[in-house]
C-alpha cells in the first residue's frame, strides 16, 4: 500500500512538473506579449502627448508674441525744445530735429521743434 502511495505521489510530482513548465512557458510568452504591447502603447501615447505638447507650445508662443506686440509701448521720445541728435533719443511724432538759433548756439546740438514750413 505504501508503495502505491509513493508511486502515485511520484507520478503526480512528475506530471505537475511537466505541465507546470508548459504553463510557465506559455505564461512567459503571454507576459512578454503583454509587456511589449504595453510599452508600444505607452510609446504611442507618449508620442501623441509630445505632438500635442509641441502644438500647444507653438500656439502659446504665437499668442505671447501677439500680446507682446499689443502691450508694447512706443519707444521714449523727446518733446519740444529738448536736445536731439545721435547721442539723444529721437523726437516725438510731429517734431523734427533741427539746428535752432535759440538753444543750439549755446549747447551746440539740434533741438526737437515743430517743423518750419519754409
From Swiss-Prot:
Ribosomal protein is among the record's keywords: no
A Gene Ontology term for the protein's cellular component: extracellular region
GO function terms (MF aspect): sodium channel inhibitor activity; toxin activity
Tissue localization of expression: Expressed by the venom gland.
Subcellular location: Secreted
Superkingdom of the organism of origin: Eukaryota
Disulfide bonds: 77-92, 84-97, 91-112
Alphabetical UniProt keywords: Disulfide bond, Ion channel impairing toxin, Knottin, Secreted, Signal, Toxin
InterPro entries hit by this protein: Toxin_22
Signal peptide start-end: 1-16
Domain notes: The presence of a 'disulfide through disulfide knot' structurally defines this protein as a knottin.
Protein name as it appears in the record: U16-barytoxin-Tl1c
Organism for this UniProt entry: Trittame loki
